[in-house]
Amino acid sequence: MEQLYFTEEHKMLRDMVRDFARNEVKPLAQELDERGGFPHESVKKMAELGLMGIPWDEKYGGTGMDTMALVIAIEEIGKVCPSTAATMMAHTSLGTAPIAVFGAEEQKERYLPGLASGKKIGAFGLTEPNA
């Protein structure tokens, strides 16, 4: 099935992210989990690799890759550290996507370059009664 869905670009991304996850993320995962820490170092390196801007238009500093590429990257990171993968996923889908999809052009120009580059981290706020 891989041949039906994965382009050569997807395979290269998968291999690169797999190596990164095993060599850079995995060694930090247990200690971060035990102390409830945020993966600052991993997020910085993910930003340097362009992973924080995978689905966003190059016009705004993203990679211009497709959603499948994003899923591949999240899956590979999630194999070694679900928390780090969740950080990337929340940044992209909850923090950045609303601006990229529904934002006015002015908002996109203002916020997406920082988010796509990973210089800023997208977040999501939720409140519930009695929380």
Question: Would you name each region that the model predicts?
Answer:
Residues 1-9:
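Intrinsic disorder at enzyme termini
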Residues 13-18:
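Extended amphipathic alpha-helical segments enriched in small hydrophobics
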